[in-house]
Amino acid sequence: MNEKIVLPGGAGLVGQNLVARLKDLGYSNIVVLDKHRANVEVLRKTQPDVVVECVDVSVPGEWLSHFDGAAVVVMLQAQIGGTDWQEFVRNNVDSTRVILDAIKTKNVPYLVHISSSVVESVADDFYTRSKKEQEEMVLASGIPCPILRPTLMFGWFDRKHLGWLSRFMQRVPVFPIPGNGRYMRQPLYVGDFCRIIISCIENRRGAGVYNISGHEKVDYIDIIREIKQATSSKTPIVRIPYGLFYALLWTWSLFDKNPPFTTQQLAALSAKDEFEVIDWPGTFGVSSTPFKKAIDETFNDPRYSSVVLEF
């Protein structure tokens, strides 16, 4: 378990979960490279024996020496939210170019690329466009690797999705739902996804593109109800017209450069996406955690449920 694993962008949702699970399995030579200082500090506190460097992986520098002797790279870096297109280019596209070059130059033998289900989405937003370009770069690189396309994920350290929704629920007198709330989601438990990544690492799965979606279809409003139950929240859930919800988000964005939820993400929420469900439990030898159990683990785990990352 001493092979060197490098995780660019490893201080985010997937990275923090992956490090925790790798450590539980006995992996001891893990390097995390991430530019989000606050989340880097969270990782240093929760996993003090992991090598963590706060760097911008879109800019070549001395940090590339961490690829020397690496056995595995799991490419995790991603700009998910925001309103500045150039941030998506820098963090999703430019960074990928730098890392792919490093993998080739340093002769790293194995790569796992984390793409996104949005590359097949009908949505057209900054995240979708940049992730499509990123995946195309990986495919064109000539590096044979598994490409994993997860849907919306939740779990420990979730700052952006269900984690933010749960904290928002604790702070407001009522919880607003756009329209009727019947927007079908296929949420993926990040614990399951990390076990898929580990399966790739341990079995050196070769080239292929895999759509990794949650095996349960759950409407947005029912996700909120499950969060309410798991956190014992008393906040009432209130439906408001879609147009008003959109206007409120637009107004919020005028005062917040990096809002937790944008009008583009609202449009993506209401897009009628249904992603392919493959037999990833059979393919990767990983069982699917029932949604209700996964929600309970997310919000009630004694080790990590109270750890919160920054946006």
Question: Predicted regions: what is each one?
Answer:
Residues 136-156, 166:
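Conserved beta-loop-beta element that borders a ligand/cofactor-binding pocket
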Residues 167-188, 196-200, 204, 211-213:
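A conserved pocket-lining segment of Rossmann-fold NAD(P)-dependent short-chain dehydrogenase/reductase
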Residues 8, 33, 73-77, 111-117, ...:
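SDR active-site strand-loop-helix element
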Residues 50-94, 102-104, 117-121:
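NAD(P)H-binding glycine-rich loop region in Rossmannoid oxidoreductase-like domains
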Residues 5-25:
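N-terminal Rossmann NAD(P)H-binding glycine-rich loop of SDR-like oxidoreductase domains
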Residues 200-261, 275-278, 283-311:
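Mid/C-terminal beta-alpha module of Rossmann-like enzyme folds, strongest
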Residues 94-132, 141, 146:
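Conserved Rossmann-fold NAD(P)-dependent oxidoreductase catalytic core, especially the SDR/UDP-sugar
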Residues 27-37:
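Conserved glycine-rich Rossmann-like NAD(P)H-binding loop of the short-chain dehydrogenase/reductase
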